[in-house]
UniProtKB/Swiss-Prot annotation:
Residues forming coiled coils: none
Region forming the signal peptide: none
InterPro entries per the UniProt record, alphabetical: OMP/PagP_b-brl, Porin_opacity
Protein name per UniProt: Protein opa
Gene Ontology CC: one annotated term: cell outer membrane
Family the entry assigns: Belongs to the opacity porin family.
Example of a GO MF term: porin activity
Transmembrane segments: none
Organism encoding this protein: Haemophilus influenzae (strain ATCC 51907 / DSM 11121 / KW20 / Rd)
Length: 121
């Protein structure tokens, strides 16, 4: 969900990053994206993201049958392109990198690629 002014978009999101070894990671974020005007159906974009990420873990070896959670500040970058279809519809493809925070002295990163279809109001 977001808002667009000129070539700049601002969006909020919820992301479930997954679960690994009893640790579930999810986040609430905000992104600022810039759309390059190419005067064609293809519109490249770049952006940055900040998020608060919750690391929720259960049944850790040193604390059997206990659960806890930590909140970490994260950041990321995104790049991609939109392809104008019909009317307000568009196809979208992009890549992203998110630094989710440190967990037990380990840097936790998320890389991804996305494709989708959108509708602009």
């Amino acid at each position: 969900m977001g808002y667009k002014v000129g070539n700049t978009r601002v969006a909020g999101d919820y992301t479930h990053h997954g679960k690994v070894d009893g640790t579930k990671i999810q986040g609430l974020g905000a992104s600022v994206l810039y759309d390059f005007d190419t005067n064609s159906k293809v519109q490249p974009y770049v952006g940055a993201r900040v998020a608060t990420n919750q690391f929720k873990y259960t049944n850790r070896a040193e604390q059997k049958f206990k659960s806890s959670s930590d909140i970490k500040l994260g950041y990321g970058v995104v790049a991609g392109a939109k392809y104008k279809l019909d009317g307000n519809w568009y196809a979208n493809g992009g890549v992203e990198y998110n630094r989710l925070g440190n967990f037990d002295s380990t840097k936790v990163n998320n890389y991804g690629a996305k494709v989708g279809v959108g509708y602009g109001f």
